[in-house]
UniProtKB/Swiss-Prot annotation:
Protein task: Involved in pre-mRNA splicing.
Any single Pfam family the record assigns to this protein: Cir_N
Name assigned to this protein: Pre-mRNA-splicing factor cwc25
Keywords: Coiled coil, mRNA processing, mRNA splicing, Nucleus, Spliceosome
GO cellular component, one term: U2-type spliceosomal complex
Gene that specifies this protein: msp-6
Basic residues composition-biased segments: 186-199, 282-293
Taxonomic classification: Eukaryota, Fungi, Dikarya, Ascomycota, Pezizomycotina
Biological source species: Neurospora crassa (strain ATCC 24698 / 74-OR23-1A / CBS 708.71 / DSM 1257 / FGSC 987)
Family label: Belongs to the CWC25 family.
GO biological process annotation, one example: mRNA splicing, via spliceosome
Amino acid sequence: MGSGDLNMKKSWHPQRSGNVAATQKAEAEAIAERKKLQQRLQEIEEERRKEEIQKALEAAGGKRKIDRVEWMYSGPTDGQAGDSAETEAYLLGKRRIDKLLQDNDTKKALSKQSQQDVLSAAGPAPVVTNARDVATKIREDPLLAIKRQEQQAYEAMMNDPIKRRQLLASMGIDDSQIAAKGGKEQRRHKHRSHHHRSDRHRDRDDDRDRDSARDRDRDRHSRRRRSDSRDRSRSRSPRRRSDSEEDRSKQRRRDSPDRTRRRDRDQSRSRGNRDRDDDRSRRHRFPQGRSRSRSGSPGGRSSRRREYSRERDSGGPSSRRDDRNSRDQNRPRRDYAKEDEQPKYDGGLNKGGRRQQQPDGDHKNAEEERAKKLAAMQAAATDLDKAREERLKALAEAERAEREADEKARQQNKKFRGGDAGFMSGLHSRAADMKIADRMNGRV
């Protein structure tokens, strides 16, 4: 047996490989910690120098630095600017609790005094005049963001009918009452606006009628005055006739072209309104043929005579009507006879969507033809029903006869052949009579 040191087998021996590795690891960690601490102390020293330089610049009249979020990184002084040595004591582990308890009152007094000194030295707070900074502060305001989220949630809930109904029910408000109230307000607003529009149209029509009546009276008075002056000029000398003509020319020159155009436009509009009302009332009162024949009555002739005299005096629509008639004469005529030879049924409606008026004879013929077609369709349907019933009866009779024959065959089999035993004996006898070729072919 060889000799050896038994202490090498102990777990506490420093030369064991495990203990050596643990020692090296602990030493490396201590060295890394000292390096980090030294680096942090250098950073603190650099920050302190920068602060001193900034304070010196501010004291010399330089630009003041605005503190925004620096208070978050000011250190373990509860938001107060304490001593730098006290700040570094946390890192070095040299800060003692007994000293803090003893100097608590003194620190409070010093902190209040330092706050007052800082406020008095700083003066008024700097005013932020940059619009971008103001917009950024408003956009990043947490309270504003919370309010905006609440508003969005409320709008989403009001847009959802189920949640809206639940909210109104919790508040004790009926949704149907709100909807009915809104519908009443909308109908009242529409009714009020309709009344306003009808009143405006009525006032405009009344003004137009008054203007047209005033123009008619002026035209009648001017015609009467011209006729009187013409009668007087016949009985007077040629000199007086020339004087009257000069007066009439002056009177005509006195009427401005704008007034003449306005009078012609009002007259044509009033005549169009009267003609349209007369045509509408005539269509409601009489058929198409009778209303067309009534236009040749003496009253119609007298009204046309009055309109012709008025148009001749005004000199407006007659020339336009002549031009329109000349254009209609030059336009090629449609051959309605060829169109009648090829009738097309459009459901009784013309291009305007109104039902065309047919003569009584054609209407009666169409009704008779429709009645004949309906009778033929009903007769064909009746014949089809009868044929179907007969076919169903024949099928039922055939099924009944087949059931009776089957029942009769069963009764005979039971009576003469003994039922199932007779059936099996018949099968055996038939199998015995079969040849081998029939058996090979599978015949029974």
